[in-house]
Structure formats: structure tokens, C-alpha cells
């Protein structure tokens, strides 16, 4: 539906110029359409169905057969295909008209229509869901609406095209209908009773390519001009003759029977003429296309029949019977040849892999062949265009040439790979650029291997991942929590005797490790076969020079570039190319080490930093401002290729795709552009030898067909996960099957259960991905986004208009956001001197809000387009949203029209957003909406746009529909997922959600899952009974809960976002399982919780709830500094800070108040020198039935998410542990806990103080569960649903389970290299992006393995030490240990003096600010020369040389040098180096087998 449905429907007709002022940026045609009442008409079907639509074509009634096409593009070509003559065409692609219409009168050099497929529009009428009145494409000269008016063709939008497609499908593909305008009644007409071929065929002979050497007679059944073009450009002179012309006596070198509409049996003269040729001895080759296939079969004596479901789309898979090769084809036909009716001498040439229908025939001895599909495409894929070459070869080679002799031979034959045990490498801890998508892909790979009875060994230190579960039907046979390094992988290969390895499911980490194993000869030595893409092919894609060379071999363009290995060479390369240039690193992840360099100074800086991390960079011409387009390509070992999804970055080149807003499918590309890039994708992937799945990225010039290839990722990637969830096509699962040698046609499409995986999904919706950044956490870090990725997570929203999915996605990213508004997330205020033009030209994480503000400020769309290079089509849509906001704000709540309200919902407005515009609360808006019967519809993702029924329940909600796709009779248990990964909420909460879902299903409960994160396992549709890929908001949860009539809702396993919804959902009638939401509210509110602790006589630090700065100052005078500020209802320590003085107090209090506006901020005395202890537990009606106690390595002051955890505790006294248990017991009772919870304590000696309590699962639940061998979420879920539990084996407070012969260490994973300018020190506010865990026979070996797993490089030579004076009394022993272990010590001047004075030799180095002066060597030089390979820098609030110490830490990070900034970690590291012994490569199972976690 379109803008005209509501606001523009009710707008008064006025002077056009006045309207133009109101809708700045829109074309006059668009303004005219928006300024008058939209004309309506009805679509009436012969069964009596009547659907109202809105006219955007010629306002005249018409009747015909209603059919649907599932193609994702090419509406210009489609409507001019003569095969649609007499038909009312329904396009399931939901958004039509984006690219307008080209010059529809233009002709090419051959005299053929240049941009369309016949002289005029052939469809009798057009039906779409959403029509774009404002178009944007460099090749357009008018709108689709204007063209339809010119040709007097009616068209309606606002039609639920999915509903219509299902109706046509279920009626055996044949439905008569009419578009009927008021006062223009028409009767139903069945065009199939007419000879449609006669109606569209030429009335006279026409010649094209006159003078060409090969004479072809083409019998016109309704020819598409591209068929003629394909022949003429290959040297044919084409004589196009009428359908009933007797060609049997004509002279020709070849005969062609073209495509066309209708029932082939009505073309009797043509059939008779062709039969005469068949029965003669004429040797000339004959080719039939589409209708030509049916005519040929009838002339040969065969039969045709009407298909139960017509094949109309651009993704039909066919197989050639000669060699089994598969192709993706464009099709448009309702009739098919009956294979069983073919007479002797004839046989099928092509077969449809889905429905097994005939797709072409051939004569066994004569040069006659046909295709039911369209090899000329237009629209659609050009995979079978080679058939024109085959036809021309038959002609040119002459008599005696057989079809098999000229048909291309398949490049490869697929053979099942015989492996017994496969090693799958995971990606390790989550980091920026490498997040939860690899948990999803690895889990899928394990599932695929198990289906094929292949044993799996999984190696991944990411303890929080679902794939590293040790038990379950979907889990690997053996799991190793070890670093993904060549050393440890080699040990596992030796121990497990694996004969296969998969490198493509673990991101860059696994890929780089695999390449190194290959280079060292390890894989060859132990007979390990790389499954899927070979290492050689991986190296072609990762090494920038090799990649460039390979593309040059096939003459595919990349940006002019030079691979260099020094800064000097980089500067020389830039001089040759010309500034600006882009640099990219080899073997790097997420654009790390890349950047735009406008000048020599920037290039010198970026190249220096990049070459510190890698040995090669590429300096290339900048294509900033071009469109960035991605294709996901799957290729099997038999050379079958499909492109599963194309994606368009809303942000232009210059912003890393991981930091870009991305839509799928592409919205602003023509069919020509899409098919050009698709064909290139397949060509490149074949040339590189990819086997499995890969991603290819293009830069496409915004106003021409010029493109360059940016890169190829020969592995599963972030984009792969997005494409999988966007389409429903399980890429990782399919890639794993392909890696075993299974060809695509033999793999089932799990969504339909009937069709093959050798196809390309059709979408009748669109998705929008928006990244989630947490840059505000990193003081000093630049807010600019560019070619190096900075986002920590992402969301994906599904809708049937761009605006619907776009606004959904914005809200998914930040619960505080209403949609596309000028209000910043988290209630932030705009700077008083904000420069909107600069904000748009230099992208930041808040650019979308800047654009909204700019539009509202009157900056034109043309200027915004110039500043951002964002296509104007997206800008038109954004402006439409803001126009609706203006309309709503000008409306009265009691009189707002139903159509306006409905339209606002159709373009993605939330109840809360509408309420703010109308002056209503969210609840009042919901009541208003429901009273007007404005409700969402549930739709399925089925991969085939309703062409086949789906057997999975992968769902979303939309207001752009007219029926539900499913029934609501399960009444399942709802589980809320974690939403976008961000700092503090990562894969550990997905693990919790999945564990809960699996438990529910195990005990026989139906499950309804709601989540919006495409990187998660919980959003795998086969993990639950119903998956709603939807917002985690009060409005949407209530929609789903009420539709499904769920038995209850579990909110405690998804982290803080669902936890914050507990009270509002409860107050609106949602049954919350487990602990009461009112108790959750008491625990989340810092002041109430502290008061309860006082009542329970549980010790805590002195505290006070403060409502003003004066309150806070009064408290600090009483207890003294330092103090800790703690807002309520936050995750990962947001706005939590230790303050050491009044100025800090003022700054941090303002921040804490902003993020916690509805609850008081609590200030507590900060206890120094205390150790933090965590209690993870499960309560049952106030009783603790399962618990685990872990100890932090770091003292308090470091956020628990950034801390290094140890199980069992190492330094906590038994007396303190008992106090921890007593306090836990009291809290569980006081809050009547039923479900998971976490309590954090401070311990100093035997003194124990409570810090906080979370009445939900914590991020350490996966770690404690796997370490102890007890799934805490399984237990908690059973408690919450009232399932009976055997408590005898659980680690209760009375019977703790403590590992006896091993220790588990969980270590944080940081992404400092990406956050330029951020200070890599640990504070109260969490900064880590992921975590790992390893196990060892002692704490030291576990610690070192965990550190290595984070990417920490153990030093081999020298260590630089710089410590603040107060650390000296405790540090001397550590320094001595490091010296004794053989490290050469360097130190900043004061630290060096102190060490030397204490007989520990240390070489002094200059402060960064003193570099270049005479005296000690510079830090940078020592690091660059390899003398220093670890830095210990221990600052505190009294540090003198603040800038210099920061410079040292940043230098370490930017050069990839190991860095430690916490004293307790440094101490543990030194002891571990001394006492750890050899680092074994055992799995957790090995430790448990010979020792284990035992009841104490």
C-alpha cells in the first residue's frame, strides 16, 4: 500500500504549488497523487471474493485470468511479456515501482525495443501490495503509474498479494477475476478459451539483423524481443513470421518456435505446419522456447496438460537429463508437456527439479530441442543463455551434428566424500566483526554432519555458545574448550584422529588457523581432508595480490590497487593511483586495518597501524559514494550454483557493511543490474573454486552499469547469517552438506519439505538490518563509522513496506527509540551547536536521527543525497514517515480517521510513537487502534512467496495484509530472546534462551519464541514450534501473546531487555512464569533492594538513594571518596562509575540520571581491595535448589562482565563462602524466587557484602552450567512451569558440587583495536564484547589457555612495565618472577629506577611525549623492532602522566602487542608462566572422566 491510503486520502485538493511546499522533495506527479483522494476499485474473483485496492493505473475496469509471479525484480520486462496477454498479473514482490519506468519507446541498434520485451504492456491489469509513487533510478524517465496511464492499463495497490497467491495456488493455479471501478461493471472472461497466440503474433513478416550470415525463421507465438536479440547478436538474420504462416517450404538455416501465451492446443495451424517439418527430411536445427516446447511436443504426437500450479517466477530449478547439471531459470507458463506421452525417438531434455514436470524435449537423432523455460531471461537469471550458443553451433556445424556434441560438458562431477570424523573449528569469543553468527553456523554444521552419520569434534573456547553444549541430539560428539591456534588444533587432530576438517564455520579465526595448518603441512601429515572450499581457494580470496591476479584472469574489475608490505610502498602506490585511496588488510576481519585516506598523512598513520597487525595491505582507488551490493552464493562440488540472496547497503561505500543499514532484497537496482551482478558472482565463485557458501561484495556506480568487486569471503559470514534469516534458507546447513560432496539438487528445502535446496528464494516481504553500536561506553573513542567495523551486534526486521521494516528495526536496536524520529536513543539531547550537514557527510552511529532532524529542518532531499550518497528512494520513504508524523500531530485523537491510523501502522509506527503524536499513552493508543479494528496479521516466511505451502512456522507480524497465514491452536509457552547483541548482552543469553526452549520441548510443551537477532541459534526456525522474528516490545509481545493465547511467558532467560518488560507485560495481563514481576521490580530498583537488604540484616556497603546533586554531595562528605554511582534497570553497568571527586560526581550523576529516569540513582561507598564473588542459582518458591560460586581474579571495581572468573574459588575462605550462602538463602526467601537468579558479593577476608541481585539468568550461567555439568537453565525452566524435578543430583546449598581435579577459567574478550581513541582500561562499566573459557588441571594452565583463547599472545622477549606508585609494595614479587622466567624488562623511567633500586634489572624507555629527544629508546621503536612483545601498564586515579600512559596503552593495542592493565591479572599471569607446566589439549570430558565435579 502507499502513502495515498490515509493521510493523502484525506488531504484536501489544493493548489499544486502549495502541496509541493508541504511535500518538499517529491516529484510533481507524486505531489498530485498525494494531494487528491485516491481512487479505489475492487478486485473481484469468480468465487465471490472482493478486495478493495487503490488505483495507480488507468481507471478502467478489466477482466481476465488472475495469475501471480514470484520474481524479485524486472516488473518493466514482466508486464511487457506477451505471455501475460489476457492476464491480470499479481506481483508477489511487495514493493513495486521503485525504479520508475525507462524510455518505453527507445529501440536498440537492431530495431528491437531497448528496455521492454514487446511494443507495449501486455498484461491486462496489475496487482501489487505497495506501490512507490516516488521512484529513483538513473535510467528512469517516468513513473510506472504514468506509463500505465499512457497504455490504459489498470493497476491496484493495497492488495494482500500473498493471500491472493495462496488462493490461486490452492485453486490449482486458475482463478478468473476482474478489476472493477465504480460504475464500470464487467463480466468475467476466461482468456484461455481464446487463441491468445493469434492475438499477440505479428501480422506480417519482419526481418532483424538483415545481412547476417545465418538465416533463422522465428514463428511468432508472442516473442520477447530479447529472444530475437540473443540470435541477432550471435550472427543471425531473424525472419519473424506470423504464427499461422506456412514455413515448411521456406528456406532457412534454423527454425525457432517462440514463447507466447495461452492454450497451445488452440494453435492448430502452427502444430500442423511444424508436424510437416518433423515428418520431412529437412536437416535444419529447430529450437523451441516456452510455448515452442509445448507446440513441438504436440507436433511430435505428444500431449500437454495444465499444471496444477503454474510455474511463474525467476527461481525455477531445472536439470538437464544429459548430465545432471542444474540451472536456475525464469519461467512463465501454465501448460506443460506430458513426458509419458512422448512418442518413440523423443525424450525429455530438461526436468523441473521441484515438481518433476517437463522443461524441454529433444529428438534422439535430429537436431531438434526445446526449453520450457526462458533462456533469454529478461527478467531473471541468464544461466541458460548458452542454449542460444548451442543452437547456433548446431546450425553452423551442419548436418550430422548431435545435440550432445555441442552441449557444454559439466565442469565437475560430484562424489560423496568418505569421512568418519570431522573437526569443526569455531570462532572463539565474540568480538567486533566476529559475533554470534558463528554459533549459528557451527550449530548448523554439526546438525548436518549428524544427519549424514558423520562423527563431529568441535573445538571452540566460547563457553557461552550453544554449539559447545556437550549433551543433546543437536550437539557435537566431542567438544574441546581450547584456543583456536595451530598448536592446539594439531594436538586435537592427533588425539581424535579426525580425517576431515571444516574451516568455513568459525569466521576469520578458523580460516586463518586452517591456512596456517596447511602451510605447516599438519593437515597432510595427519591425513586430514579440508571439506568444502580448499585452502588454496581460501588463500586466493584472503591474499589481496592473489585475489587481484585471479580476477584479472577472468577480466573482472576490481578497483585499481597495489598490494604492499611497507608504509613507503603504500605511499608510492597512492601516488600512482591518486588520492583518496582505501587501504585493506589481508587475512583481516570486519575491515580491521582498513580505512579511507584522503591524504598522505592519514595514509601514513593508517598504514603504520595496519602493518603492525598484518604483513600485507592493499592500497586501492576509493569508490566511496558508490552503492554497496552483496550476493550470497552457494556452489556445490558438481558446479551447480545458486545466489540465495542479494542485499543492498542503504549506506553507500565508505561505511563497512557490518556498520551499514542493509535491506534484502535490493530495492533500487534494475533487473539488468541485479542479473549482471548475479552472473558475475557465479562467474567469480566458479573461477575461485569455492565449494560451499561465500559472500561477494560489489561497488556499483550509482548512475551507470560500472562496478568493481570489493572482496569475496570464502566462508560463512555475518552477511550469511543475515541472508539465512532473511530468506529462511539455512546456508550453513546446506554448505555443510555440500562439503560432504552432496550435490544441491539432492538436498531438500526444509521449509517446504517438498522442493529442492537448489533454488533461489523468493521473498514477498523485505528485511532491514540495522547495526547496534555501543560507542558511548568508550570515552575518547571516535563516534565516526567507516570502513573498519565498530558495531557489536545487529537486528533484523521483517515488513512488507520499507518503512515498516525500517522503523521496526530502529526500535529493535534501542528500546528507547520510537522509530525514524529526530530524537536520539537513550534520551540524549542534541548538542546546541550540532552541524547536521557535517553529521550526515561524516557518518556516525546516529546518522539516521541526524537525517530525520535535517529533513524536519528543511534541508532538501537533493542535498541530503549529495551529503550521504544514500539513494533518493530511501530518502523519499523516510520523508514519508516524517510527513505522517506531522499529520498525526495535527490530528485529534478522538477524530483521527481509521485509514490514517491504519496507514501509520502500515509504515511502521508503533503505538507509543502514535500516542506521542496524539497526546495519548501507549495503552490508550492500543485501545483506540483495536476499537477501530486496526490489527496486525501473522505471515509466514516460506522461501517461495506462497508458491508452495510451508511446513515450518517462521513468522512475522505486519499491518500490510488481510489474513493470517496460520492457525492459533497450540497455546504454547512464550520465551523471549535477548534482542541485539550489545555490550553486556551477548551470546550467553541466547544460550539461556535455547536451553529453556529445548527443555520446554523435551517435556512436551509447545514453544513460541520472540526474538529479532539474526545472529542467534534461538532464531533458527527448527529450534521451536513457532518463531516470531519480531520486536521485543510491550506492544508486539502482547500482540503475539493474545493471538497465540500462550500458556505463559518466560522473560528471565533473555537478559535485561525482556526483564525490563516484566512489569508492563504483567500489568497488561500477560502471565509471567517464575518469579513475580513485582519482586523483579523490587530487586531492579536499587533503593528498594538496598532497603530490603537492611531489613534482612544482610551486610552491604553504605548507600543512599539520591534525587539531586546535593544529596550525593552530602553522602560523599559522610563516607568519603571513592563512591560508586548505580542507576536502576540497566545491564552491564551502563552509566555506572566510580567517582573520586566532586567534578566527576557532577558529570557521572547526570549520565546515570539520564539512563534511569524513572528510578532513583543509588550512591554507595566504593570498597577498595575487596574480591568479587558471584552466586549463580536457581530458586524454587523461595528455596535455593541449585547453585554455583565463582570468584573473580580482579578486585572489585572491574565490571563482572569484564572480570576473569574461576571455578572453584581459589582464595575465598570457607567462612566467607558460608556467609555468601546464608545471604543467598535469605534473598531467595525474601523475593520468593522461582527461577534463575544471580547475586554479586564483595569479600574481604571473612567480611561479605552484597553488591546486587538480578532475578534472571546471568551471563555466567553457561559457564557454571558447563563447568559443573548441570544445566541451570534446564532446572530453572522446569521450576517455572511447575515440572517435577529430582533435586537429589542438584548442587544445593547443602550439597555443593565442586570440581575436584580441574579448574575452569572464564576470561573476557575485548575489541580495543577497532575502537580507535578508546582507553583500554577496565572500569565499572562493561567493555568486553565476548568471553571464552578453558579448563586445566590447575588454575594456572586454565588461565593461560583462556588468555591465549582471547587472542593474547604470550610474550617471548621483552616486557614493558609502567606502574603507578601505589602498586609498588605488591608488585616487586611479580616483577622478580617475570625476570626469573627469562624476560627482558623495560620500564618507564620512574618504574625503571625503582626496579633497578630493588635489584631487578630494567631498561628505561622514554615516555611517548619525549620520543625524538635524546635519551632512552622510544616505546614505539622497541615494539616495532620486536624487542617488546607485552606491555604491563597499571594506572589509577592518581596517575601523573595520564596522556603518556594512555599513549602507551593505545600503542600496544594498535600494534597488536599483548597488554595487561589490572594488577591481579598481571600477578596471575606471572604465576601462571611459572607454575602452569605444559598446556595440555584435553576436553572437559577428559577432566571429568578422571576426576570430575563432585558433591562436597
UniProtKB/Swiss-Prot annotation:
GO molecular function list: ATP binding; carbamoyl-phosphate synthase (ammonia) activity; carbamoyl-phosphate synthase (glutamine-hydrolyzing) activity; metal ion binding
Protein origin, superkingdom: Eukaryota
Residue ranges occupied by any ATP-grasp domain in the UniProt entry: 548-740, 1090-1281
Keywords, alphabetical: Allosteric enzyme, ATP-binding, Ligase, Mitochondrion, Nucleotide-binding, Repeat, Transit peptide, Urea cycle
Stretch forming the transit peptide: 1-33
Pfam families on file: CPSase_L_D2 (PF02786), CPSase_L_D3 (PF02787), CPSase_sm_chain (PF00988), GATase (PF00117), MGS (PF02142)
Domain Glutamine amidotransferase type-1: 215-401
Cytoplasm listed as a keyword: no
Active-site residue numbers: 290 (for gatase activity)
Function: Involved in the urea cycle of ureotelic animals where the enzyme plays an important role in removing excess ammonia from the cell.
UniProt-recorded name of the protein: Carbamoyl-phosphate synthase [ammonia], mitochondrial
Natural source organism: Aquarana catesbeiana
Amino acid at each position: 500500500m502507499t502513502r495515498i491510503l490515509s493521510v493523502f486520502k484525506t488531504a484536501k485538493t489544493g493548489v499544486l504549488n502549495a502541496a509541493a511546499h508541504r511535500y518538499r522533495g517529491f516529484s510533481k506527479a507524486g505531489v498530485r497523487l498525494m494531494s487528491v483522494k485516491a481512487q479505489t476499485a475492487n478486485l473481484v474473483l469468480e468465487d465471490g471474493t472482493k478486495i478493495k485496492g487503490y488505483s495507480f493505473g488507468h481507471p478502467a475496469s478489466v477482466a481476465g485470468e488472475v495469475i501471480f509471479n514470484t520474481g524479485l525484480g524486472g516488473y518493466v520486462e514482466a508486464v511487457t511479456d506477451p505471455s501475460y496477454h489476457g492476464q491480470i498479473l499479481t506481483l508477489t514482490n511487495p514493493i513495486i515501482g521503485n525504479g520508475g519506468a525507462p524510455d518505453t519507446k527507445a529501440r536498440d541498434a537492431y530495431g528491437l525495443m531497448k528496455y521492454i520485451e514487446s511494443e507495449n504492456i501486455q498484461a491486462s491489469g496489475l496487482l501489487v501490495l505497495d506501490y512507490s509513487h516516488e521512484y529513483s533510478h538513473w535510467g528512469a524517465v517516468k513513473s510506472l503509474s504514468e506509463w500505465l496511464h499512457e497504455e490504459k492499463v489498470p493497476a491496484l495497490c493495497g492488495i494482500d498479494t500473498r493471500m491472493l497467491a495462496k488462493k490461486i495456488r490452492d485453486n490449482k493455479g486458475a482463478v478468473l477475476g476482474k478489476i472493477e471501478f465504480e460504475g464500470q461493471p464487467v463480466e468475467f472472461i476466461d482468456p484461455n478459451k481464446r487463441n491468445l497466440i493469434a492475438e499477440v503474433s505479428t501480422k506480417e513478416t519482419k526481418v532483424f539483423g538483415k545481412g547476417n550470415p545465418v538465416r533463422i525463421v522465428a514463428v511468432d507465438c508472442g516473442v520477447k524481443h530479447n529472444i530475437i536479440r540473443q540470435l541477432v547478436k550471435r550472427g543471425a538474420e531473424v525472419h519473424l513470421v506470423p504464427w499461422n504462416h506456412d514455413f515448411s517450404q521456406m528456406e532457412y538455416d534454423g527454425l525457432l518456435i517462440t514463447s507466447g501465451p495461452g492454450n497451445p492446443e488452440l494453435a492448430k495451424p502452427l502444430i500442423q505446419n511444424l508436424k510437416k517439418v518433423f515428418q520431412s527430411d529437412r536437416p535444419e536445427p529447430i529450437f523451441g522456447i516456452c510455448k515452442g516446447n509445448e507446440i513441438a511436443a504436440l507436433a511430435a504426437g505428444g500431449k500437454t496438460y495444465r499444471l496444477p500450479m503454474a510455474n511463474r517466477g525467476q527461481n525455477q530449478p531445472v536439470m538437464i537429463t544429459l548430465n545432471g547439471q542444474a540451472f536456475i531459470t525464469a519461467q512463465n507458463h501454465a501448460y506443460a508437456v506430458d513426458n509419458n506421452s512422448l512418442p518413440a525417438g523423443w525424450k525429455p531434455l530438461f526436468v523441473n527439479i521441484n515438481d518433476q514436470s517437463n522443461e524441454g524435449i529433444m529428438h534422439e537423432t535430429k537436431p531438434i530441442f526445446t526449453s520450457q523455460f526462458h533462456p533469454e531471461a529478461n527478467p531473471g537469471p541468464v544461466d541458460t543463455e548458452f542454449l542460444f550458443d548451442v543452437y547456433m553451433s548446431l546450425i553452423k556445424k551442419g548436418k550430422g551434428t548431435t545435440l550432445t556434441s555441442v552441449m557444454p560438458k559439466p565442469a565437475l562431477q560430484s562424489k560423496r566424500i568418505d569421512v568418519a570424523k570431522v573437526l569443526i573449528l569455531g570462532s572463539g569469543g565474540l568480538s567486533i566483526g566476529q559475533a554470534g553468527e558463528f554459533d549459528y553456523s557451527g550449530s548448523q554444521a554439526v546438525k548436518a554432519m549428524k544427519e549424514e552419520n558423520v562423527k563431529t569434534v568441535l573445538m571452540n573456547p566460547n563457553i557461552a555458545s550453544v554449539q559447545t553444549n556437550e549433551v543433546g541430539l543437536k550437539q557435537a560428539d566431542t567438544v574441546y574448550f581450547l584456543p583456536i591456534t595451530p598448536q592446539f588444533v594439531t594436538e586435537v587432530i592427533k588425539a581424535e584422529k579426525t580425517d576431515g576438517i571444516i574451516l568455513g564455520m568459525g569466521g576469520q579465526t578458523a580460516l586463518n588457523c586452517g591456512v596456517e595448518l596447511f602451510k605447516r603441512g599438519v593437515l597432510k601429515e595427519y591425513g586430514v581432508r579440508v571439506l568444502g572450499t580448499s585452502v588454496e581457494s581460501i588463500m586466493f580470496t584472503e591474499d589481496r595480490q592473489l585475489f587481484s591476479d585471479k580476477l584479472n584472469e577472468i577480466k573482472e574489475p576490481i578497483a585499481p590497487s597495489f598490494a604492499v608490505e611497507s608504509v613507503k610502498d603504500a605511499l608510492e602506490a597512492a601516488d600512482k593511483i591518486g588520492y583518496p585511496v582505501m587501504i585493506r588488510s589481508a587475512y583481516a576481519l570486519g575491515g580491521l586495518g582498513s580505512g579511507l585516506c584522503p591524504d598522505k598523512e592519514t595514509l601514513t598513520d593508517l598504514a603504520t597501524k595496519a602493518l603492525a597487525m598484518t604483513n600485507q595491505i592493499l592500497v586501492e582507488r576509493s569508490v566511496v559514494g558508490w552503492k554497496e551490493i552483496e550476493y550470497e552464493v552457494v556452489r556445490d562440488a558438481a558446479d551447480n550454483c545458486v545466489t540465495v540472496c542479494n542485499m543492498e547497503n542503504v549506506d553507500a561505500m565508505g561505511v563497512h557493511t557490518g556498520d551499514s543499514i542493509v535491506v534484502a532484497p535490493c530495492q533500487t537496482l534494475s533487473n539488468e543490474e541485479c542479473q549482471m551482478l548475479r552472473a558475475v558472482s557465479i562467474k567469480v565463485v566458479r573461477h575461485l573454486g569455492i565449494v560451499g557458501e561465500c559472500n561477494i561484495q560489489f561497488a556499483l556506480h550509482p548512475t551507470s552499469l560500472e562496478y568493481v568487486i570489493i572482496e569475496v569471503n570464502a566462508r560463512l559470514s555475518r552477511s550469511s547469517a543475515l541472508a539465512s534469516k532473511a530468506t529462511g534458507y539455512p546456508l550453513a546447513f546446506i554448505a555443510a552438506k555440500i562439503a560432504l560432496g552432496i550435490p544441491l539438487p539432492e538436498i531438500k528445502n526444509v521449509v517446504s519439505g517438498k522442493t529442492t535446496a537448489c533454488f533461489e528464494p523468493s521473498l514477498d516481504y523485505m528485511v532491514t538490518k540495522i547495526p547496534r553500536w555501543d560507542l558511548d561506553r568508550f570515552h575518547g573513542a571516535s563516534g565516526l563509522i567507516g570502513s573498519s567495523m565498530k558495531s557489536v551486534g545487529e537486528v533484523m526486521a521483517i515488513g512488507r513496506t520499507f518503512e515498516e521494516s525500517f522503523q521496526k528495526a530502529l526500535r529493535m536496536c534501542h528500546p528507547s527509540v520510537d522509530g525514524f524520529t529526530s530524537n536520539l536513543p537513550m534520551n540524549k539531547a542534541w548538542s546546541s551547536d550540532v552541524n547536521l550537514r557535517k553529521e550526515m557527510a561524516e557518518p556516525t552511529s546516529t546518522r539516521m536521527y541526524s537525517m530525520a532532524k535535517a529533513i524536519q529542518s528543511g534541508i532538501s532531499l537533493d542535498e541530503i543525497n549529495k551529503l550521504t550518497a544514500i539513494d533518493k528512494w530511501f530518502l523519499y520513504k523516510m520523508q514519508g514517515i516524517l510527513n505522517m508524523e506531522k499529520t498525526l500531530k495535527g490530528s485529534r485523537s478522538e477524530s483521527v480517521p481509521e485509514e490514517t491510523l491504519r496507514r501509520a501502522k502500515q509504515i511502521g509506527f508503533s503505538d507509543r510513537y502514535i500516542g506521542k503524536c496524539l497526546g495519548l499513552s501507549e495503552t490508550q493508543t492500543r485501545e483506540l487502534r483495536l476499537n477501530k479494528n486496526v490489527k496486525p496479521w501473522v505471515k509466514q516466511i516460506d522461501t517461495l512467496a506462497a508458491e508452495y505451502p510451508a511446513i515450518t512456522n517462521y513468522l512475522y507480524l505486519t499491518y500490510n495484509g488481510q489474513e493470517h497465514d496460520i492457525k492459533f491452536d497450540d497455546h504454547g509457552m512464550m520465551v523471549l530472546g535477548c534482542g541485539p547483541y550489545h555490550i553486556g548482552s551477548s551470546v550467553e543469553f541466547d544460550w539461556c534462551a535455547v536451553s529453556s526452549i529445548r527443555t520446554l520441548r523435551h517435556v512436551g510443551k509447545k514453544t513460541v519464541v520472540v526474538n529479532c537477532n539474526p545472529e542467534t541459534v534461538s532464531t533458527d526456525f527448527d529450534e521451536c514450534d513457532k518463531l516470531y522474528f519480531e520486536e521485543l516490545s510491550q506492544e508486539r509481545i502482547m500482540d503475539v501473546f493474545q493471538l497465540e493465547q500462550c500458556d505463559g511467558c518466560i522473560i528471565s532467560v533473555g537478559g535485561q531487555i525482556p526483564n525490563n518488560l516484566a512489569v508492563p507485560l504483567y500489568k497488561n495481563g500477560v502471565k509471567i512464569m517464575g518469579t513475580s514481576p513485582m519482586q523483579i521490580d523490587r530487586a531492579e530498583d536499587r533503593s528498594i533492594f538496598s532497603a530490603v537488604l537492611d531489613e534482612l540484616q544482610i551486610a552491604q556497603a553504605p548507600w543512599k538513594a539520591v534525587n539531586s546533586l546535593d544529596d550525593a554531595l552530602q553522602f560523599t562528605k559522610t563516607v568519603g571518596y571513592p563512591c560508586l554511582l548505580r542507576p536502576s534497570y540497566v545491564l552491564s553497568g551502563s552509566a555506572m562509575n566510580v567517582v573520586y571527586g566532586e567534578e566527576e560526581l557532577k558529570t557521572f550523576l547526570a549520565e546515570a540520571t539520564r539512563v534511569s529516569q524513572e528510578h532513583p540513582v543509588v550512591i554507595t561507598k566504593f570498597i577498595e581491595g575487596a574480591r568479587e564473588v558471584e552466586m549463580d542459582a536457581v530458586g524454587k518458591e523461595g528455596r535455593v535448589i541449585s547453585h554455583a560460586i565463582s570468584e573473580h581474579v580482579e578486585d572489585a571495581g572491574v565490571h563482572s562482565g569484564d572480570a576473569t572468573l574461576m571455578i572453584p574459588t581459589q582464595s575465598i575462605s570457607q567462612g566467607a563462602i558460608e556467609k555468601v550462602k546464608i545471604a543467598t538463602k535469605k534473598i531467595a526467601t525474601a523475593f520468593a524466587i522461582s527461577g534463575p537468579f544471580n547475586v554479586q558479593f564483595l569479600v574481604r577476608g571473612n567480611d561479605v557484602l552484597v553488591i546486587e541481585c538480578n532475578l534472571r539468568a546471568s551471563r555466567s550461567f553457561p559457564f557454571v552450567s558447563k563447568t559443573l555439568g548441570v544445566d541451570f537453565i534446564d532446572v530453572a525452566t522446569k521450576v517455572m512451569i511447575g515440572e517435577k524435578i529430582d533435586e537429589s543430583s542438584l548442587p544445593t546449598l547443602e550439597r555443593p558440587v565442586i570440581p575436584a581435579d580441574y579448574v575452569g577459567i572464564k576470561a573476557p574478550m575485548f575489541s580495543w583495536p577497532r575502537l580507535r581513541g578508546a582507553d583500554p582500561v577496565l572500569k565499572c562499566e562493561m567493555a568486553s564484547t565476548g568471553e571464552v573459557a578453558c579448563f586445566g588441571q590447575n588454575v594456572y594452565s586454565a588461565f593461560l589457555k583462556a588468555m591465549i583463547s582471547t587472542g593474547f599472545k604470550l610474550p617471548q622477549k621483552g616486557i614493558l612495565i609502567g606502574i603507578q606508585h601505589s602498586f609498588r609494595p605488591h608488585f616487586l614479587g611479580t616483577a622478580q618472577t617475570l625476570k626469573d622466567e627469562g624476560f627482558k624488562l623495560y620500564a618507564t623511567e620512574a618504574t625503571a629506577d625503582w626496579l633497578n633500586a630493588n635489584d631487578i634489572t630494567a631498561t628505561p624507555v622514554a615516555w611517548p611525549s619525549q620520543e625524538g629527544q635524546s635519551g632512552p629508546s622510544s616505546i614505539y621503536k622497541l615494539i616495532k623492532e620486536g624487542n617488546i612483545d607485552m606491555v604491563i601498564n597499571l594506572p589509577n586515579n592518581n596517575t601523573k602522566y595520564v596522556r603518556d600512559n594512555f599513549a602507551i596503552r593505545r600503542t600496544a593495542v594498535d600494534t597488536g602487542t599483548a597488554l595487561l592493565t589490572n594488577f591481579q591479572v598481571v600477578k596471575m599471569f606471572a604465576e601462571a608462566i611459572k607454575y602452569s607446566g605444559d598446556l595440555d589439549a584435553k576436553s572437559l570430558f577428559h577432566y571429568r572422566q578422571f576426576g570430575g565435579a563432585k558433591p562436597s
